[in-house]
Amino acid sequence: MKKVSILSLHLGYGGIEKSIVALANLLCESYKVEIACVYKLYDKSVFELDKRVKVKYLTKIKPNKKEFHEYLKKKKVFKTLKEGIKGIKGLYIRKNSTINYIENTNSDIIISTRDIFDEWLGQFGKEGVLKIGWEHNHYHDDMGYANEIVRATSKLDYLVLVSESLKEFYSKKLVNTNCKCIYIPNILDNMPKKMSTLTEKRLVSVGRLSKEKGYMDLLALYNIISKEYPTWSLDIIGDGSEREKLENYIKEHNLGDKVTLHGFQNKEYIDKILNKSSIYLMTSYTESFGIVLIEAMSHGLPCIAFDDAEGARELIDSGRTGYLIKNRNNRAYIQKIEDLMDDLETRKRIGKESREEVKKYDGKEVIKKWLQIMKEK
């Protein structure tokens, strides 16, 4: 049986990490699968990993970006300098350990999941190894970032993109290289057996509590809505750097009995909340694909998102499987929420279409596309 290696920064919480685990679990039916992981953040992967998948940790170090910025903010010069030196040393170890793995692994296929891994794989990957880059992020009109991806992947065999628009964009950029661009969507690893009844007065959102996800915007929108619809609650599942700000906002606006911050939770917990909710809300400023969006749609939830989240534009057919709000128009966003709150039949109609739409992201379908390009090896 041939061997596939997937290069991963860590196996903690994150959309990329969730996708890595989903792919590894499916590939182990046809290949020996090893995840080469730079950082060991937890004792095991936070997402359930098939026992047949081997995990190899390349270093014993942990990232210290958070500590560095905290000391910098507090103007603690000595500790900032100490963490800075530690960080530089960590980057050196990360580079050498990853390159050493790429040069010495006996894998037939190596899949890179970060741009820096793409570069090292292109430079140091052995001849005869199938080299695949897997780009999850959107360039968001940042041509500097886009050009960096092009430079890093130009020596690879394939660049897998998670959206059609990204595939079209990078195909033009890489036209004079040997790297072929392929569109393969992220994987919906489980289709729930039952849809939500959509009868509970619960709004829900899942994601990292970081600025680009727009959760402060979501709370501001909900604060307005809750005055007219006081019996509707809001569940936010996830954690991150903005949590304290969200907690303060909830306290200041007396929303504690209506808004629940659940923190990081496992898939079973998230599925349970989604299946008891009636409307899914996304307020992200940027989103390459939106795994949580297809998970919500798989439960038959009508979804609302701002259209500047690129991934949402590819997943939501506005009016049929949810609503896309242009120009971050808060009033329009609120109106669509209220429309759905007022009309159970519309919720059911859109929810049914949503669930049908995401069947094409089922793992059994998506893995066929991966296996097709791997046949070269």
Regions found by a protein language model. Name each.
Residues 285:
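Aromatic "clamp/platform" in nucleotide-sugar-dependent glycosyltransferases that forms part
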Residues 231, 332, 339, 346-360, ...:
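A short, well-ordered alpha-helix in the C-terminal region of glycosyltransferases
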Residues 247-265:
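Nucleotide-activated donor-binding/catalytic signature segment of Leloir-type glycosyltransferases, i.e.
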Residues 317-319, 323-330, 339-344:
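Conserved acidic donor-binding segment of nucleotide-sugar-dependent glycosyltransferases
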Residues 133-140, 154-192:
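Donor nucleotide-sugar binding/catalytic pocket of nucleotide-sugar-dependent glycosyltransferases
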Residues 17-22, 201-230, 241-247, 331:
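A conserved mid-protein helix/loop that constitutes part of the nucleotide-sugar donor-binding site
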Residues 264-265, 272-277, 370:
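Short alpha-helical donor nucleotide-sugar binding micro-motif in glycosyltransferases
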Residues 302-306:
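Short hydrophobic beta-strand element within catalytic cores of glycosyltransferases
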